[in-house]
Amino acid sequence: MSHGKMPLVLSLVLILCGLFNSISCEKQQTSPKTITPVSFKRIAALSQKMEANYKAFAQELFKTLLIEDPRKNMIFSPVSISISLATLSLGLRSATRTNAIDVLDVALKNLAVMLMAQAPTALLEIVHELVNRTAKHQDILIDRTEMNQMFLKEIDRYIKMDIQMIDFKDKEKTKKAINQFVADKIDKKAKNLITHLDPQTLLCLVNYIFFKGILERAFQTNLTKKEDFFVNEKTIVQVDMMRKTERMIYSRSEELLATMVKIPCKENASIILVLPDTGKFNFALKEMAAKRARLQKTNDFRLVHLVVPKIKDNLQDRFKHLLPKIGINDIFTTKAVTWNTTGTSTILEAVHHAVIEVKEDGLTKNAAKDKDFWKVPVDKKEVPVVVKFDRPFFLFVEDEITRRDLFVAKVFNPKTE
């Protein structure tokens, strides 16, 4: 690739990065247009070209991040991290890029090749469809005046991404500005996102993703009450437990020693809850990455009485700390970056922030007050399976179109964020 083409290619990756990372199941107040199934198929086809490699990368993230501290809540977005890493890789020197690609296998190469091969008009068509689907929360690119202005114009040409020109030498003012900007974008869900900035920073990529689970069928708010959650043998906390009885996908694995239920949400997403047997959390934690797929394949549609705590969890981590954990090094050094700049100092900062919130909310605005809404047509002789999440469990938010994990979470103690 010629040096002159780099800004265009990178800007296209940033477009996709911002859009793919901006997935939210929160009900939108307005919708510019309805997305047709054909549009979703085209988006899915774009992602399927690197599906096998993405899954391997996501599994590596799962094993590394979830297992490293088994007694701590953890949440991250593998799709968000992988797309952002693909973005960063296109601005790296060959040696560093090879290190990143070794971890992601050919996934990054595929993404780069796709972007260079597709006509801009075709890309823009998909981009606009994605904007209409997920426009509420977007990645922001924050850099300073040393960045080549043609590079910035190319980004602005293809999408109105949020670009803030900031002097990173004024660290305190810059941190405050970034934190306020992101907080305003995601309804104050992120606090103190940026805690450290190097004065020599050239570009800061803030990668945030917020999921508010709007369920197809809400929980009954009048049944929510305080109950015990058994963190471990010595620790019991009181949490708000939600309840509902309905037919849903249910699975039981004696191999994994765990039970799974799947709850549909709006916007083609589902929440998958996996409950390890009592005393088997550590066993399930070690086996989950490899055996979860089998658990989902052997499922049944059954009447379930579900009891689960309200969930609000978040994690923020600098890529500088996150990536070495999965074997990607030297990505943020002054020797790594080759982006077209007007200065000589080139330090890159990138932050990942994931937030998930699941409450009683459903698609029907007044569903909790509608008695007919709660009538479940079942055989009176049928006894529901009781699944009570009163001990540590796993949570996955899955895209029903691509079957990708938008979020992966380990809920060890619902009382701590």
UniProtKB/Swiss-Prot annotation:
It holds the Pfam family Serpin. GO terms for cellular component: extracellular space. Glycans are attached at N132, N222, N268, N340. Residues 1-25 form the signal peptide. Keywords: Glycoprotein, Pregnancy, Protease inhibitor, Secreted, Serine protease inhibitor, Signal. Coiled coil: none annotated. PROSITE patterns: SERPIN. Its main location: secreted. Transmembrane segments: none annotated. It is found in: Secreted, Extracellular space. Induction: By progesterone. Residues 26-40 form a propeptide. One of its GO terms (molecular function) is serine-type endopeptidase inhibitor activity. The record marks V378, D379 as: Reactive bond. One of its GO terms (biological process) is female pregnancy. A series of at least four post-translational proteolytic processing steps and differential N-linked glycosylation generate various molecular forms. Three mature forms starting at positions 41, 45 and 100 are produced. Gene3D superfamilies: Alpha-1-antitrypsin, domain 1 (2.30.39.10), Antithrombin, subunit I, domain 2 (3.30.497.10). InterPro entries: Serpin_CS, Serpin_dom, Serpin_fam, Serpin_sf, Serpin_sf_1, Serpin_sf_2. SMART domains: SERPIN (SM00093). It comes from the Eukaryota. Belongs to the serpin family. UTMP subfamily. The UFAP are a group of three (MW 42 kDa, 48 kDa, and 50 kDa) antigenically related, basic glycoproteins secreted by the porcine uterus. Heterodimer with the iron-binding acid phosphatase, UF. This is Uteroferrin-associated protein. It comes from Sus scrofa.
